[in-house]
């Protein structure tokens, strides 16, 4: 594992962030299995963990594991809250929701602060003023060290930071959109923001110019880049991955990128998801990809991707042929 430092956080962050949104991490009957997976991830060097208020028992499982292992002082927690607009979620986008959900999350996580606090979704009809004010209060109280937005557009992030600068406050210093070699053809949850695709080039340029840390989710396109199915038809997609990523990503442009990733992986003697991660890490955006491997081999493969070097030409070819 490789590590990096971020201003305002006095411990190293792992180059890869461990995502905890899957059913394997929801506690209950899965709790012991989740602890074993977390132990393997820790041994592999993961120190940054992504969770959210909307992950239900996931926060409790992560908090219990960190406490039982005595790891909290070394771990970096990225927590998310306030999730308006997602299908099945009735969160109200307000300063009150931000505070109430963070404080509930802190109790579940068995901690008095999180290093990174990310607003899960946005409601562009609501002015950013009160939200920025509340986040600054939470930072002043020591409950968050840095904050930002997940599914927030560039325009709304800039609006938040413009308000903060005009009022002598701290603005967003981190974002967490989706990003991978392939791009959405269907928004899975509603209100999602991704960096992939030509339309998002201005956002990528802005993030690169400002070198704002980006903790990108769906870095393997929810399994579309897992290598479980083959574009030559020998392993049909419908038999190998869930229907959701098929609906979200399966289109000719993405099939072509996956086919090129398969070819390059074969040439380099590695796995397709390693090519996808290596491509991400070659981008000029200041990325911390979120991954969720749940087996020893997959955990090892993800970490090994950090050592895989791609040339500019290879990265361009993967994207555009």
Residue ranges and their predicted role:
Residues 73-86, 175-179:
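A short, structured active-site edge motif that brings together acidic residues
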Residues 1-76, 140:
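N-terminal binding-site loop/beta-alpha segment at the start of enzyme catalytic domains
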Residues 21-32, 84-96, 120, 125:
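Active-site mouth loops of central-metabolism enzymes
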Residues 18, 51, 79, 116-119, ...:
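Conserved beta-strand positions
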Residues 106-127:
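Active-site groove signature of glycoside hydrolases
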Residues 29-41, 93-109, 158-162:
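Short, acidic/polar
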Residues 128-321:
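Beta/alpha (TIM)-barrel catalytic core signal, keyed to glycine-rich beta->alpha loops juxtaposed to Asp/Glu
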